[in-house]
């Protein structure tokens, strides 16, 4: 029984005998449930990785909450400092906050209990309306009391640790308002319709400088490709700079050289008068087309 109670076993919950207690007293090691442990028992009492992970998560969550609390107090302090920077009056003859003139000719004023400054009734807050003598506070002092109340500074006798909010940069540096990059458009090769329109327009420009409508038909005939096997009668004839009409095709024997000694203006006038028909007459019937010949369609001038 005594051996069971005062045994020198390895059980940490059993008190050792007097001999071992005296020996431990001399060695200044003492005895407790923690010191009287074997290495095996110490290893069995180590925390598992899951328990360590849970403890670390609790510590990290507490740190995040602490940072959020510091940021909340920092926003309150920033708001109070902004109000203190925006004062416009001197607090004597003017309202401390809005700068309005006080006195008989101005607005009625109240006296702040904390800062001992005068403010108008719009910038003042009545702190104790139930008392016989009302207690007025300016908005700055009222905000300061609110900061001390909501941050716990009244308990710690001072503001706790806080983090001021960061200054927001300008909106020009914001990536959502940056203009989107414009992609270069692919150039398409000109189609056949575009080239046909350009040829038609070129023919119209050439024909607009002529003196008669017969030049339109001659210029369009020159632009058309001739069929294979047919020899063109175009030749190397020079075209007039002033856009005069081309020489009519030769249907008969060649004219004598004396007929070509006239000026280009006389040729243009003769061609114009020859192309027009007398009023009241019937229009000339078109002749059948013959390969190698040109037909000039004349319209009456008005």
From Swiss-Prot:
Its main location: cytoplasm. Residues 185-197 have a biased composition (Polar residues). The modification Phosphoserine is found at residue 248. It is found in: Cytoplasm; Cytoplasmic vesicle, Secretory vesicle membrane. Residues 174-302 are annotated as: Disordered. Residues 258-269 have a biased composition (Low complexity). A zinc finger (FYVE-type) spans 89-146. One of its GO terms (molecular function) is zinc ion binding. One of its GO terms (cellular component) is transport vesicle membrane. GO terms for biological process: exocytosis; G protein-coupled receptor signaling pathway; glucose homeostasis; intracellular protein transport; negative regulation of G protein-coupled receptor signaling pathway; positive regulation of insulin secretion; regulation of calcium ion-dependent exocytosis; response to xenobiotic stimulus. Zn(2+) 2 binds at residues 112, 115, 138, 141. Signal peptide: none annotated. Zn(2+) 1 binds at residues 95, 98, 120, 123. Highly expressed in pancreatic islets. High to moderate expression in adrenal gland, pituitary gland and ovary. Pfam families: FYVE_2. Keywords: Cytoplasm, Cytoplasmic vesicle, Exocytosis, Membrane, Metal-binding, Phosphoprotein, Zinc, Zinc-finger. The keyword Zinc applies. CDD domains: FYVE_RPH3L. InterPro entries: FYVE_2, Noc2_FYVE, Rab_BD, Rabphilin/DOC2/Noc2, Znf_FYVE-rel, Znf_FYVE_PHD, Znf_RING/FYVE/PHD. Residues 41-158 form the RabBD domain. Rab GTPase effector involved in the late steps of regulated exocytosis, both in endocrine and exocrine cells. Regulates the exocytosis of dense-core vesicles in neuroendocrine cells through interaction with RAB27A. Acts as a potential RAB3B effector protein in epithelial cells. Recruited to dense-core vesicles through specific interaction with RAB27A in endocrine cells. Interacts with RAB3A, RAB3B, RAB3C and RAB3D. Interacts with ZYX. The N-terminus of the RabBD domain is necessary and sufficient for interaction with RAB27A. This is Rab effector Noc2. The lineage of its organism: Eukaryota, Metazoa, Chordata, Craniata, Vertebrata. The gene is Rph3al.
